[in-house]
Amino acid sequence: MATIITDLKETFRRGNIYIQLIYINVAVFILTTLTEVMFQLFNRSIAGVFEWLELPASVIRFILQPWSLLTYMFMHAGFMHILFNMLWLYWFGALFLSFFSAKHLRGVYILGGICGGLLYMAAYNIFPYFRPMTDYSFMLGASASVPVSYTHLRAHETRSN
């Protein structure tokens, strides 16, 4: 068991930035899943526990938890959600690094997540269709962060040609 943990630590240290982001996302997913299991085993309600890490659509709730603009992009709703986000990050992260640096990928990942989160909040607070759902809507997952790396890559290819 100790060698597995040592190997994981070493892979994290030596891995590319996209591997490190995948490790962080998977670690958060495992921790939240284990927390959910523990709550269920002890017949405790999980309602509201992770809302403090998910991005609320409500501006008033966001003011009370501004850190959620960063934490939401590391939370995932289920196995398939994290699987496809991490596959997307793995494939396009490697491709991204063939044109840009690790620092660029980290920045694009974080800024893409922040911009995606702000766009989500703006949409829920501007468009009348979403207004009735604003108070109980939350965003989670790397779905805003990961595709930005691909679109940034496509923009670079377009300018290069």
Name the predicted role of every residue range.
Residues 151-158:
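Conserved small/polar residues in nucleotide/adenosyl-binding loops
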Residues 136-150:
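Membrane-interface loop-to-helix entry segments
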Residues 14-140:
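N-terminal TM1-TM2 helical hairpin plus the immediately adjacent luminal interfacial "cap"
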